[in-house]
């Protein structure tokens, strides 16, 4: 069996040297949510731990302010 070589993903926030993740930046937050409304895990989106925590709190804050849906209806 051939082994697949996994490429390390680079945190997009670190690459752009962004210090904080804002809940107001909806276009960027929507990239990290599935079509069902769930937050993508770190191993899939490639964020570092620091920015994944900030991203999670920003998404949850945007949901509370009704900027993002909790779930997507069919």
UniProtKB/Swiss-Prot annotation:
Any single biological process term in GO:
translation
What exactly does this protein do?
Binds as a heterodimer with protein bS6 to the central domain of the 16S rRNA, where it helps stabilize the platform of the 30S subunit.
* Quaternary context: Part of the 30S ribosomal subunit. Forms a tight heterodimer with protein bS6.
So what family is this one in? Belongs to the bacterial ribosomal protein bS18 family.
Question: Which portions of this protein are annotated as coiled-coil regions?
Answer: none
An example Gene Ontology cellular component term from the record?
Answer: cytosolic small ribosomal subunit
From which lineage does this chain's organism come?
Bacteria, Bacillati, Bacillota, Clostridia, Natranaerobiales
The name of this protein is: Small ribosomal subunit protein bS18
Q: Mention any Pfam family matching this sequence.
A: Ribosomal_S18
Tell me the keywords, alphabetical order: Ribonucleoprotein, Ribosomal protein, RNA-binding, rRNA-binding
MF (Gene Ontology): small ribosomal subunit rRNA binding; structural constituent of ribosome
Q: Which Gene3D superfamilies match?
A: Ribosomal protein S18 (4.10.640.10)
């Amino acid at each position: 069996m051939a082994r697949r070589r996994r490429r390390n993903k680079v945190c997009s926030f670190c690459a752009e040297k962004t210090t904080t993740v804002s809940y107001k930046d909806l276009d960027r937050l929507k990239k990290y949510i599935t079509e069902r409304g769930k937050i993508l895990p770190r191993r899939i989106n490639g964020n570092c731990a620091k920015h994944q925590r900030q991203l999670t709190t920003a998404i949850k804050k945007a949901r509370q302010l009704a900027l993002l849906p909790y779930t997507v209806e069919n």
